[in-house]
């Protein structure tokens, strides 16, 4: 994955151990498991990031939907769940991020 490759290349002595940990845990174990299809794993991740208010990572994972099979409609549906289970303000902010991210993705095509 290009994102992982860029993150590993940008690692310094200060954060190399952290980068190795997240690469191994997230990409080497969780994302590599075949028990949940990538589309659903992507939706779970987006909902969790939105609910937790992790804006930078949310935009990153929305951009990654181009590779996971999750559509814009899928993401917006997941964010409706965020509104109910994590709160309207979190979902409102996440929807704004999603709209901006999808618009930028369309402009880049």
List the predicted regions and their residue ranges.
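Acidic, glycine/proline-rich low-complexity segments that act as flexible tails and inter-domain linkers
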Residues: 1-39, 67, 92-109
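N-terminal alpha-helical segment
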Residues: 23, 40-42, 58, 75
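Short alpha-helix boundary/capping elements
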Residues: 26, 48-54, 87
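Helical "substrate-binding/catalytic lid" subdomain
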Residues: 36, 40-43, 53-54
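Short, structured motif recognition centered on aromatic/hydrophobic residues
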Residues: 41-49, 79
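Mid-chain, well-packed structural core segment of small domains
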Residues: 51-76
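C-terminal structural segments of small proteins and small subunits
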Residues: 83-91
